[in-house]
Amino acid sequence: MSNKLVLVLNCGSSSLKFAVIDAQTGDDQISGLAECFGLEDSRIKWKINGEKHESSLGAFTAHREAVEFIVNKILAGQPELAAQIQAVGHRIVHGGEKFTRSVIIDEHVIKGIEECSSLAPLHNPAHLIGIRAAIASFPKLPQVAVFDTAFHQSMPERAFIYALPYKLYREHGIRRYGMHGTSHLFVSREAAKVLNKPLEETNVICAHLGNGASVTAVKGGKSVDTSMGLTPLEGLVMGTRCGDLDPSIIYHLVHQLGYTLEEVNNLMNKQSGLLGISELTNDCRGIEEGYADGHKGATLALEIFCYRLAKYIASYTVPLGRLDAVVFTGGIGENSDIIREKVLNMLQIFNFHVDSERNKAARFGKKGIITTDNSTVAMVIPTNEEWVIAEDSIKLITK
């Protein structure tokens, strides 16, 4: 067993994903999910060596109780494995401009994450709860913060500044930050290996497609543009998020249709996207089933999703100058051969030609090139954000 194990925590507002990761191989020794925090049926599910387990956490429990369960029940039952854990790595959604790389957590870092909470009000406060719970449960282990936004700090001003009065950026930090950076970092790095090219000479466009979705142009291993903005709302059509729209729609909804700003925010974040267009579901699998059955709303939602994605991919050839590959990842990107084929068919001007057999084979955790031999390359690479967090954690504590 490796002596480079890291407990990785990803705290959401009402859930906590966790895994014990081998930083050398990326393999998970333990993985699990605690969910339904604050409700009567809070539960925790986990897997050890392929064997599944489940337990109740008790009514109205939350992050601290979940971390305590991980320590006192799960890890206590695996003493040899627990003894090999070298650090606790935390996924943090928003680091603003304060954090351009992963850092060992101290009071200064905690304060910085708190100050960025206004940019990610649903996520950063939950991360802080998880950090404090982990410090209490693992007082002797170093704690490491890995930021989703850090990878995008290499973007030039022309990519991240909005065409608003510049003082809004200077005084209030209003700019494009981007998300999913840890995923884009991992898959762009893996794409260079598939292409057999040095990372610093590789130009790829990465599409992380899940209930949240974003596209990033990666030039020589660095993010040069990305679709999400100040918040995760900008960019692609997503499960329940609208992505790009005319900002005056907000004014129209408030002043002409009587919506409150809170209602508009809820509408754009939780009632739009695939769900809003289809009037059926936010789940892409349900959208594809509806499409196959001729459901009009599902068909329209699928077409808009693919069209928006194809437009973004096409536009990101501009900052790259030369395109080596398009990379699909995330739950939808890794599993939907239908969406991949539709998107690439819209991009035939860039010499993309789908190989149907390869495309259908690259699902359910399998990676590979999905285009023909004479085509511009498109590939599927399953993401592994936990591995990046584990790697960064070990690198920091062994400096």
Curated annotation (Swiss-Prot):
GO MF term (any one): ATP binding
Residue positions binding Mg(2+): N10, E385
Domain of life per record: Bacteria
Annotated binding of substrate, by residue: R91
Pathway(s) annotated for this protein in UniProt: Metabolic intermediate biosynthesis; acetyl-CoA biosynthesis; acetyl-CoA from acetate: step 1/2
Cofactor(s) named in the record: Mg(2+); Mn(2+)
Catalytic activity annotation: acetate + ATP = acetyl phosphate + ADP
Keywords tagged on the record: ATP-binding, Cytoplasm, Kinase, Magnesium, Metal-binding, Nucleotide-binding, Transferase
Cofactor note: Mg(2+). Can also accept Mn(2+).
Annotated positions for site Transition state stabilizer: H180, R241
A single cellular component GO annotation: cytosol
Active site, UniProt feature: D148
Cell compartments where the protein resides: Cytoplasm
Keyword set includes Chloroplast: no
Binding site for ATP: K17, H208, L209, G210, N211, G212, D283, C284, R285, G331, I332, G333, E334, N335
Pfam families named in the record: Acetate_kinase
Top-rank EC class of the record's enzyme: transferase
Stated family: Belongs to the acetokinase family.
Subunit annotation: Homodimer.
Free-text function comment from the UniProt entry: Catalyzes the formation of acetyl phosphate from acetate and ATP. Can also catalyze the reverse reaction.
Annotated HAMAP family: Acetate_kinase
Record protein name field: Acetate kinase
